[in-house]
Amino acid sequence: MLQLCDSECDGLSSLMECGGAVNSPGDTLGQSPAHLAACGGQAFFLLWQLQTGVDVNQQDCFGEAPIHKAARSGSMECLSLLIASDARIDMCNKDGHTAEDVALSCGFLDCARYLATIKLTQDTFSRAQSSLHNLKETAAGVKRGQCCQSISHGKRRRSDGFV
């Protein structure tokens, strides 16, 4: 697989020399320049791609997004850039593996731990947002109930006590 990444990096420069579009599947495997940069651990080139509007979740013919390629190469820098650009860490390739699974199978334990921590943080944040939304709905219902109790038969009380 490393030979594949090396040949992809060689193809990266020729792809860009030809003026390939940022999201175009530039090679026969359907890999964009971002896939190639992530696979080669080329964080600066990947950053440039991200700034030009690359689709960080575009999948190649293997179902792999750039985050899978970065995990396969063990590039913490590329993983960080992709996550900061809202790459989906729960996306599976055609074999059903997430980027965390790929990093683990390639022996990049730090990358796998990093991805697991990000996933846990995102899950916790999502649950907290959901709980906050439910709490706001409950509070709004209580306010509506209190408002209705202060009105007697659809009329407001006068300050002198008469209805």
UniProtKB/Swiss-Prot annotation:
Pfam family of the protein (one): Ank_2
Highest taxon listed in the record's lineage: Eukaryota
The protein's name in its UniProt record: Ankyrin repeat domain-containing protein 37
Keyword Hydrolase: no
Gene name of the encoded protein: ankrd37
Gene3D superfamilies: Ankyrin repeat-containing domain (1.25.40.20)
Record's keyword annotation contains Cell membrane: no
PROSITE patterns registered for this protein in UniProt: ANK_REP_REGION (PS50297), ANK_REPEAT (PS50088)
Localization, UniProt: Nucleus; Cytoplasm
SS bond list: none
SUPFAM superfamilies associated with the record: Ankyrin repeat (SSF48403)
Subcellular location, principal: nucleus
Repeat (ANK) residue spans along the chain: 29-58, 62-91, 95-124
GO cellular component: cytoplasm; nucleus
UniProt KW keywords: ANK repeat, Cytoplasm, Nucleus, Repeat
Motif segment (Nuclear localization signal): 129-149
